[in-house]
């Protein structure tokens, strides 16, 4: 009886050791950059960050040129501002697919993930701000017998 109790205690100790949250480690390549992929709607962004002067390049162009609307530039800066790291990292990203709004959201998502790869201690702040969550909303498909996804054709009674 005591053997089974002892083995149960060992088993429960093993289970609690396994269920601990995984420790997030720093993931940096040989060039000192952290990499992550971000997605939003149809857009996919590949983002690399490294310590620097705060320069942001999107598809080999300055962020002010690529994203002309101030709202989109502000969206991209949000993770850096929330983590109090604005102007401390150089960001290089390539983004494809979707429109400008989706692309800005994809860059923001990728930048947040890259920041957590570079500094794992920022994960809590970024998670609380909702920057690490993939926005799963995508365009609803068009249905047959309808003008659009939900819009019906005009109905005439007579």
UniProtKB/Swiss-Prot annotation:
PROSITE patterns: RIBOSOMAL_S9. The keyword Thylakoid does not apply. InterPro entries: Ribosomal_Su5_D2-typ_SF (IPR020568), Ribosomal_uS9 (IPR000754), Ribosomal_uS9_bac/plastid (IPR023035), Ribosomal_uS9_CS (IPR020574), Ribsml_uS5_D2-typ_fold_subgr (IPR014721). One of its GO terms (molecular function) is RNA binding. Gene3D superfamilies: 3.30.230.10. One of its GO terms (biological process) is translation. SUPFAM superfamilies: Ribosomal protein S5 domain 2-like. Keywords: Ribonucleoprotein, Ribosomal protein. The keyword Ribonucleoprotein applies. GO terms for cellular component: cytosolic small ribosomal subunit. HAMAP family: Ribosomal_uS9_B (MF_00532_B). Belongs to the universal ribosomal protein uS9 family. NCBIfam families: PRK00132.1. This is Small ribosomal subunit protein uS9. It comes from Nitrobacter hamburgensis (strain DSM 10229 / NCIMB 13809 / X14). The gene is rpsI.
């Amino acid at each position: 009886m005591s053997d089974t109790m002892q083995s149960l205690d060992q088993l429960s100790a093993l289970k609690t050791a396994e269920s601990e949250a995984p420790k997030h480690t720093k993931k940096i390549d040989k060039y000192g950059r952290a990499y992550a992929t971000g997605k939003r709607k149809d857009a996919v962004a590949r983002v690399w960050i490294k310590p620097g002067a705060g320069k942001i390049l999107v598809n080999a162009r300055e962020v002010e040129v690529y994203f002309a609307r101030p709202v989109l530039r502000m969206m991209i800066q949000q993770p850096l501002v929330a983590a109090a790291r604005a102007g401390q990292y150089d960001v290089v990203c390539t983004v494809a697919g979707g429109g400008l709004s989706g692309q800005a959201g994809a860059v923001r998502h990728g930048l947040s993930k890259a920041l957590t790869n570079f500094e794992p201690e920022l994960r809590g702040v970024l998670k609380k701000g909702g920057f690490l969550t993939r926005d799963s909303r995508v365009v609803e498909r068009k249905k047959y017998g309808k003008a659009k996804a939900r819009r019906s054709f005009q109905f005439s009674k007579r």
